[in-house]
A protein has these predicted regions:
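Cytochrome P450 catalytic domain signature, combining two hallmark sequence patches
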Residues: 81-94, 212, 220-221, 294-297
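Non-heme Fe(II)-dependent double-stranded beta-helix
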Residues: 14-58, 65-171, 176-178
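Short, structured patches in soluble enzyme cores that scaffold and shape functional sites
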Residues: 160-161, 172-174, 190-194, 206
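Short edge-strand/loop segments of extracellular domains
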Residues: 164, 205-212, 271, 277-283
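Short, conserved beta-strand element in jelly-roll/cupin
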Residues: 180-197, 252, 277-281
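Double-stranded beta-helix
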Residues: 195-260
Length: 344
């Protein structure tokens, strides 16, 4: 279900500095829709559990067609468009910066930078989107597939929603967040709509979880890391696979598999999708780019979902409440504070 018209009115200019320049790194020229030598949809289904697990362990990813009912995917899109896309005052936690920022829009009018941690959306204005997104990401089909892969139930530690395409750099999730048992976290990506080839498809390097990239140690947010990963994708020995993904399709991958997104070549197209990361219930999780992890969680659809909002003090709780419910006042106060800081 694609839309070609612009949404959200005239797009606000993207005022982010040149940070994007260093992440717009292209994968190799030959991008495959399935692994070389395979026919269409080579991945075994979860109903063949041993083959499903063997493929996942060997290739590092697996694709489940039609896992999520289209009506639930569409409900998530509709709630986003009704409650979030046009909210020009609201502050949302962003993937690239890790900060709470207002929307930036693509030339096609889509939200450029994805929202992180839907479970932490506190405003009543966004309650429908929060509920619809978590309904998709905790769906029983996902839980069944996770149980087949891990042998136990799993805990959701992180969520995201994409509307437009920020062009995510090639990376390993495990360099940012993972299970305490390194490499045991599983990523989940649900296509909320049919993803057009020109929208910037998700790409993955099968079997990359078994290979090291020279110089990949260090800060995974640095320009050097992103350049080394880009070089490996472009010039390394592994295929770059960007599967055709349709509404309701589910892609799952190991935390040390290299993946990212292709650049958008036609700004008319969105790439609406929901993402989550899961660890087995018997495993603690860890942040590799944050000083501490939250111990708080909620239960949704019988699934434990970790909360990450920093609200350990009265001041933090007050700040979060003002940011959620009175974003105009919060924005004015933040601008004033930043103007008063030394060196501003």
């Amino acid at each position: 279900m694609q839309t070609q018209h612009r949404e959200g009115g005239a797009p606000a200019p993207d005022t982010r500095s040149g940070a994007d320049d260093m992440i717009r790194v292209l994968p190799r020229r030959t991008v495959l829709e399935q692994p070389a030598g395979c026919g269409d949809d080579p991945c075994p289904p979860p109903s063949r559990p041993q083959e499903f697990r063997d493929w996942f362990e060997r290739e590092g990813y697996v694709l489940v067609r039609g896992a999520i009912p289209p009506r639930l995917c569409q409900a998530g899109i509709d709630a986003f468009r009704a409650e979030v896309l046009g909210d020009r005052l609201g502050f949302f936690e962003r993937h690239v910066s890790g900060k709470f920022e207002r929307h930036q829009y693509t030339p096609g009018g889509y939200m450029k930078y994805p929202i992180m941690n839907l479970q932490d959306l506190a405003s009543r204005r966004h309650a429908g989107f929060r509920r619809a997104g978590l309904t998709v990401l905790t769906h029983p089909a996902i839980q069944r597939a996770l149980t087949v892969l891990t042998g136990e139930a799993a805990r959701c530690v992180h969520t995201m929603y994409f509307d437009g395409n920020q062009v995510t750099w090639a990376h390993r999730d495990g360099h940012y967040i993972d299970s305490r048992n390194d490499g045991e976290m599983i990523g989940v990506w649900v296509a909320a709509e049919d993803i057009h080839p020109d929208a910037g498809r998700f790409f993955i390097l099968p079997r990359s979880h078994r290979m090291r990239v020279p110089g990949e140690e260090g800060d995974p947010n640095s320009a050097q890391y992103k350049a080394r990963m880009a070089d490996f994708v472009r010039d390394g020995p592994l295929d770059c696979v960007a599967p055709v993904l349709r509404q309701g399709d589910l892609l799952m991958w190991k935390s040390m598999v290299i993946h990212g997104s292709l650049p958008t070549t036609d700004e008319r197209w969105s790439r609406r999708s929901f993402t989550a990361h899961y660890v087995p219930l018997s495993h603690p999780y860890k942040w590799n780019v944050r000083s501490a992890q939250s111990a708080r969680s909620l239960r949704f659809n019988r699934v434990e979902v970790m909360l990450h909002a920093v609200d350990g003090t009265r001041v933090a709780r007050l700040r979060n409440h003002v940011r959620s419910e009175w974003p105009r006042a919060y924005g004015a106060a933040r601008a004033l504070w930043q103007g008063l800081r030394p060196g501003a």
